[in-house]
Amino acid sequence: MAIVAGVDFGTLSVRVSLVDSDKGRLGTASAAYPLHRRREDPDFATQSHADQMAALVQATRAVLAETAVDPAAIVALALDTTGSSVIPVDSQLQPLDDYMLWCDHRAHREAQQITQLAHQEDLEAIAWCGGVYSHEWGFAKLLYWLRHNPDKRGRFATALEHCDMVAATLIGITDPAEVPRSICAMGHKWMWNTRWDGLPPQWFLSKLDPLFDGIRARLGGRYLASDAIAGHLNDHWAGQLGL
């Protein structure tokens, strides 16, 4: 018998299900967190990383109590989150802002500029994301954030997709170079592909905006497929989650 905790971060709540390899799903619990919107700006949608992690603790402890499962029997966490939710962090992987959620659509101009330059330069990557770069995706959101937060640029180290930020937090990673990055999340959303050695070339990113100088290196890490182990739960979060 092996039990896995399936963790699913949605737009308004996180759900934790305990699944037994023999018996199937044993139980599920969820916990909500706030979604920040602005009446004067319908494109604005953000969420706090701290709020999400607090909800994860609440949901995990609730499902453990509901099922009376021995925490020692849980062998793994399988993590799923919303895609296209991006967070900028400092050199210690501490958030510089809230997540720009998938439904945050402020980066229209940046997405149009990426699409235009990609076609102008015959960038192969644009064909792999339908020929149009979306305002929901990573480079557009990050460029918007850098343009609108000049006071935070000096502390900016890298940006992470939602799933990678949660994984790094649970593992206890504080070095951006050690972050496990999901190939699924970084694929068309950040135009990552082994065909062109990962991310788009630095010359393209710098031509898009000098604020992206050096950004390719900043988006380094361990790029992994979804069947890989991102890491191991650290003692702090094992204690917080009751595992």
Region locations from a protein language model:
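Short, intrinsically disordered/low-complexity patches at protein termini
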Residues: 49-51, 120-121, 177-178
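Hydrophobic packing residues within well-ordered alpha-helices of enzyme cores
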Residues: 111-114, 145
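N-terminal glycine/serine-rich phosphate-binding loop of ATP-dependent small-molecule kinases
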Residues: 1-98, 109, 214-217, 222, ...
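Gly/Ser/Thr-rich active-site cleft segment
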Residues: 9-11, 125-243
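Carbohydrate-associated surface elements
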Residues: 104
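Active-site catalytic pocket residues across diverse enzymes, especially alpha/beta-hydrolases
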Residues: 67, 118, 149
